[in-house]
Every structure is written in structure tokens, then in C-alpha cells.
């Protein structure tokens, strides 16, 4: 490699080492052994392109031409980034438990073991061991759902939007579906109930007003082309004040009298009474079925605490129509999702232990007093490491559920707050936290970076992570 710097652009270009000479350099041998020739060659090509740009703009060679160890360092950094995982663990201390951008519900240890097992070994996904013949992939879930909800059967797809699309496509394509104007929700990403209706080939019939819908509104809208009335749980917003809605039991009776279906989209969905965790009670699939709803859909990765999935429960004959619809194959879940979902549902067989088994329930169950004790220990240990640039204090704050669930319900929590002091910058601190081995994601306020302690998984691990970050400042 060059140690003298030529003085013309042409000479500088000629002075750049060739790809073959770089690959033959003993300094790069460990990288070639670890990453392979193709990856190292691509990284070298990037460095050579940058070097040519430097020559064109500044008429000089890069420093690594005179110091091979610098090139090795650049390559190590680049290859490490190329081979790093973008989907990696982070600390969700944002104050939103079910954070859509951070993957929503954390899985239970039982679900993690179940997924690992079916990844490692063949599994009877569509095979009945007892009969020795082909089975259905939803069978692993069906028995559990029947016990937990009282449904005759169930169907599992990859999210609740898919569940709603499949329901409408299978039972109402080419016909009318009646929905209250107050329930025409947008579920995120500009994805709205009318859009799903249109995609399913249904005609949306709006009834009532935004804040008030009565039984007579539904009665007057039913025609010979009506396939169903659809109830949509407004889980991601709340209308209060001068309001009126028709209960499912009354609509169920109307639908039976008029020979049409009653279907329900519960959105986030829940199988247990959440009031013991300080949350509002959510309508459950079992309650909807008891009220006469024919098909109910809900999410698996929100309040249920499982993997991303959409569940549809209801009458056997209707579920059979869903299972045989062409969309079902396109929307079906793989063995990893089904294994995690089965493990999650098993926890619900013993609802008294949910706060010990499901991470989301454990977070709901924590008291503010417990969180304050954790905060005091962290503050005492970390304050000396962040002084004098940052001060630490504990503040009372509120945690929200997230993912469109219970938008007007908050749990009392404790925040560990960092305040900028002598030369400190909250913007730089936030970036520093995001560059940790396990990035720490908090919430930036006007004058503080707040870590909501309700999101902690392991106090000792978080202390170690933050201590390292403090030392690195």
C-alpha cells in the first residue's frame, strides 16, 4: 500500500490499490474467514468508490492507503452493520405498553418455547396423529377457543383486518351490510371499515348518526339484499355525552327475525375481566356469542397478549364457509404463529395466573408503589454516573395501553426523568440511549427524557444497560 502521496489526480487514481491486492493482504484474512470473500469484496468496493470520490473532490488519498489498519477498522464497522439484525430487542419505556412501532405484545416464556420447538423440529401442523390422516392447521386452536369462548368453531388468520375481510367476503360478498355511522372506524394507516367493505365486494349501508343510532334505524335499513348487520367495537376512540347505541342482544333478536346475520369486529379483543388490573372491562367474544352474534373477530396481539393474528369465532356452518373461502389460504397463519397462539390461549385456562405468565398482564398488574421503589433504586445508582451533565428525578406519570386499545384509560406509573444540566443535551442523550446494545426508547417531553418504569422487564438488566450508557458519556 502507498506511503507517498502523488500530486496529480491521475497519479492518485493509479496509487489506489487494486481489489486483488487488497484481498491478498494478510490484514484482511480474519475478515475473509469470518464473512467470506463476496461480503468483504463488496465492502472494499464501497471503500474504493469513496476513495475515488475523495480524489475527485479533494485531490488526496484516504488515510487508509498509508495505514492498512484503518481500512481494517472501516471494514469491521461496515460488515458488522451489514450482518447485524434490525429486528432486535429494545427497552420499551415509552409509556405505551402495546406500542405498535415496537412490536405490540411481548410473548410469554411458554409461547417462546413453543415457537422454538416447532422451528427446530417437524410438527403435525396439518396431520392428525391419532387418525394418521391429514388434518386442519386451525385444529390446535379450535379446542381451546371452544372452551374459552363457547364458540362452536374458530378460524385463525394473520391479523384482525384480515379476519374482517375474510368474514365479509365469505358471508356478504355482493350484498349489503348495515353499520352504524358511529362505528365506521379507521384502524390505522388510513385503513377504514368502508375500504374493507369495498374490497370484500359488499355494499355498505350507513345508519344512524355519529353519536346516536337506534334499533329502528337498523330495522328500516334491512332489505331483501341485506346479508348482515355489523357491529364494530370502537376500541381506538370513545364518544361520550349525548349518545345512543343498540346492544348486541337486541340486534341479535332482530337479525334472527329477519333472517340475516349479525357479525362483530371487537378490534383489540380480550378474553378476561381487565378491571382487576385497573382497566375498563372490554366486550369479550364469549359475551358477544351469548348475545346472539353469529361471527366475532378480534386480534391476538393486543389485549390478548399473543402473536399477531386475527381470530374469528362463531357457528360451525359459518366458520366452514370461511375455511373453504379462497382468501383463507392467502391469509392463513404459519406454524410459528399458531404455536405461540396456542401457548398463549393455554394461559387463559387459569385466569388467576395471567399476571404471572403473560408479560402484558404483568405490566398491567404492577402497582405505582412497586414502580416507585424500582425508580428510587435506579436513581440512586445512576445519578452519580450522569452528573454533572444530567440530573435525575422521579415523577408520577400515566401509562397508556396502546395499539388502539382503551384510549381514555391510563394506569398510574413512575417515570425516571433525565434533565439536561451543565453542557448536557437531551437530544444527544436520546440518541445515545438508542445506540445502546439494547436500545432504550423513552419519551421526550419539553424539558425531560422520561423512562416509564412500567415497561421494565428486568430491573438489574436495565440498570446495567443505563450504567454502561452513563459511563460512556
From Swiss-Prot:
SUPFAM superfamilies: PLP-dependent transferases. Its cofactor is pyridoxal 5'-phosphate. One of its GO terms (biological process) is conversion of seryl-tRNAsec to selenocys-tRNAsec. The modification N6-(pyridoxal phosphate)lysine is found at residue 302. It catalyses: L-seryl-tRNA(Sec) + selenophosphate + H(+) = L-selenocysteinyl-tRNA(Sec) + phosphate. It is an enzyme of class 2 (transferase). One of its GO terms (molecular function) is L-seryl-tRNA(Sec) selenium transferase activity. It is found in: Cytoplasm. One of its GO terms (cellular component) is cytoplasm. Keywords: Cytoplasm, Protein biosynthesis, Pyridoxal phosphate, Selenium, Transferase. Pathway: Aminoacyl-tRNA biosynthesis; selenocysteinyl-tRNA(Sec) biosynthesis; selenocysteinyl-tRNA(Sec) from L-seryl-tRNA(Sec) (bacterial route): step 1/1. Its EC number is 2.9.1.1. Belongs to the SelA family. HAMAP family: SelA (MF_00423). NCBIfam families: selA (TIGR00474). Converts seryl-tRNA(Sec) to selenocysteinyl-tRNA(Sec) required for selenoprotein biosynthesis. This is L-seryl-tRNA(Sec) selenium transferase. It comes from Shewanella oneidensis (strain ATCC 700550 / JCM 31522 / CIP 106686 / LMG 19005 / NCIMB 14063 / MR-1).
Amino acid at each position: 500500500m502507498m506511503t507517498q502521496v502523488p500530486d496529480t489526480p491521475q497519479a492518485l487514481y493509479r496509487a489506489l490499490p487494486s481489489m486483488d491486492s487488497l484481498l491478498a493482504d494478510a490484514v484482511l484474512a480474519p475478515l475473509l474467514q469470518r464473512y467470506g470473500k463476496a461480503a468483504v469484496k463488496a465492502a472494499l468496493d464501497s471503500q474504493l468508490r469513496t476513495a475515488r470520490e475523495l480524489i475527485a473532490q479533494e485531490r488526496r488519498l484516504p488515510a487508509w492507503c498509508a495505514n492498512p489498519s484503518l481500512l481494517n477498522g472501516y471494514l469491521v464497522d461496515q460488515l458488522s452493520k451489514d450482518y447485524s439484525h434490525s429486528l432486535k430487542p429494545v427497552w420499551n419505556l415509552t409509556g405505551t405498553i402495546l406500542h405498535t412501532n415496537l412490536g405490540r405484545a411481548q410473548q410469554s416464556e411458554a409461547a417462546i418455547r413453543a415457537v422454538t420447538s416447532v422451528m427446530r423440529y417437524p410438527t403435525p401442523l396439518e396431520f392428525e396423529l391419532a387418525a394418521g390422516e391429514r388434518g386442519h392447521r386451525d385444529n390446535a386452536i379450535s379446542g381451546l377457543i371452544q372452551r374459552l369462548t363457547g364458540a362452536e368453531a374458530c378460524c385463525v388468520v394473520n391479523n384482525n383486518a384480515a379476519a374482517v375481510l375474510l368474514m365479509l367476503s365469505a358471508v356478504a360478498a355482493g350484498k349489503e351490510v348495515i353499520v352504524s355511522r358511529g362505528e365506521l372506524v379507521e384502524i390505522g394507516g388510513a385503513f377504514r371499515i368502508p375500504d374493507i367493505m369495498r374490497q370484500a365486494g359488499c355494499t355498505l349501508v350507513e345508519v344512524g348518526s355519529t353519536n346516536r343510532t337506534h334499533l329502528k334505524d337498523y330495522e328500516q335499513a334491512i332489505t331483501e339484499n341485506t346479508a348482515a348487520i355489523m357491529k364494530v367495537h370502537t376500541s381506538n376512540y370513545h364518544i361520550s355525552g349525548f349518545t345512543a347505541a343498540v346492544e348486541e342482544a337486541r340486534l341479535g333478536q332482530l337479525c334472527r327475525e329477519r333472517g340475516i346475520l349479525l357479525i362483530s369486529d371487537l378490534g383489540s379483543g380480550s378474553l378476561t375481566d381487565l378491571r382487576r388490573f385497573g382497566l375498563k372491562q372490554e366486550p369479550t367474544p364469549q359475551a358477544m356469542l351469548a348475545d346472539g352474534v353469529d361471527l366475532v373477530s378480534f386480534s391476538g396481539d393486543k389485549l390478548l397478549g399473543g402473536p399477531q393474528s386475527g381470530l374469528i369465532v362463531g357457528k360451525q356452518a359459518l366458520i366452514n364457509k370461511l375455511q373453504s373461502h379462497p382468501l383463507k389460504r392467502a391469509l392463513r397463519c404459519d406454524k410459528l404463529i399458531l404455536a405461540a397462539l396456542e401457548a398463549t390461549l393455554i394461559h387463559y385456562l387459569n385466569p388467576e395466573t395471567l399476571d404471572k405468565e403473560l408479560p402484558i398482564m404483568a405490566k398491567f398488574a404492577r402497582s405505582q408503589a412497586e414502580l416507585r421503589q424500582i425508580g428510587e433504586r435506579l436513581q440512586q445508582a445512576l445519578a452519580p454516573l450522569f452528573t454533572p451533565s444530567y440530573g435525575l428525578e422521579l415523577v408520577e406519570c400515566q401509562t397508556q395501553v396502546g395499539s388502539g386499545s382503551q384510549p381514555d384509560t391510563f394506569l398510574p406509573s413512575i417515570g425516571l426523568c433525565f434533565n439536561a444540566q451543565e453542557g448536557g443535551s437531551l437530544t444527544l442523550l436520546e440518541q445515545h440511549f438508542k445506540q445502546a446494545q439494547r436500545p432504550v426508547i423513552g419519551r421526550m417531553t419539553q424539558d425531560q427524557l422520561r423512562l416509564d418504569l412500567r415497561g421494565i422487564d428486568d430491573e438489574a438488566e436495565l440498570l446495567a444497560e443505563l450504567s454502561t450508557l452513563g459511563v460512556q458519556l
